[in-house]
Regions:
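Conserved beta-hairpin
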Residues: 26, 68-83
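Conserved acetyl-CoA-binding loop-helix of GNAT-fold acetyltransferases
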Residues: 116-121, 127-143
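Conserved N-terminal entry element of GNAT/NAT acetyltransferase domains
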Residues: 1-47
């Protein structure tokens, strides 16, 4: 199911689509182009034990069937970004995490929550609102596949030195920011003991 299209101030049309049947586009955004070269392939949370040759094969299989491993953003038809969104139970690292807790309260067990764990935007498409569109599309994708709650574990937007909203670098911000998730209607459920780029990460939730 496609998310509604959006037109940013620059005039381009953004569309967010499931990654099912679009492995080649996923590979352009989140993979590596040299066979066997080191790269995450968005496997860090899923199963980091797989080697460099196994990772693209795993994700190709995930992209071959519903619900798929996430969503892709397209700007005027060109693949531009990626968000990993899947049930928490599919992320081995999260199921064994000592720093990101399970929440037992609420109408849905933590293991049944869908989780948006990673965002990637191609350099030429940054600063165009793509992460907002990706998160909105990820939530819609999760809802379409029966999710009742979506979680994320973004970093604190505020500067850790107490100087307001500081600039977040691309590497630290791959998990998103609290400001991004708050704009999408998520609320802070718990502070975690996980950090990225020296900033604390929050467990944020949205009922869908």
């Amino acid at each position: 199911m496609a998310s509604p299209t959006a037109t940013p101030p620059t005039g381009e049309t953004i569309e967010v689509l499931p990654a099912v049947g679009r492995f080649d586009d996923f590979a352009l955004v989140a993979g590596v182009q040299k066979p066997g070269a080191g790269g995450c392939w968005c496997m860090s949370y899923r199963d980091s034990r797989l080697n460099n040759l196994e990772r693209p094969l795993y994700m190709a299989d995930e992209c071959s069937r519903d619900p798929g491993p996430g969503v892709l953003a397209y700007v005027d038809g060109e693949v531009a970004g990626w968000c990993s969104i899947a049930p928490r139970s599919s992320y081995r690292r999260l199921m064994n995490s000592r720093t990101i807790p399970f929440l037992d309260e609420g109408p849905v067990a933590a293991a049944d929550a869908w989780v948006a764990v990673c965002f990637v935007v191609q350099p030429k498409f940054r600063h165009q609102g793509l992460m907002n569109a990706l998160l909105e599309g990820a939530v819609e994708h999760a809802r379409a596949h029966g999710a009742r709650v979506v979680e994320g574990y973004p970093i604190e937007s505020a500067d850790p030195r107490g100087q307001g909203a500081g600039k977040v670098d691309v590497i630290s911000g791959y998990v998103g920011t609290t400001r991004l998730f708050e704009r999408a209607g998520f609320t802070r459920a718990a502070e975690t003991t996980a950090h990225s780029g020296g900033r604390v990460r929050w467990l944020m939730r949205k009922l869908v």
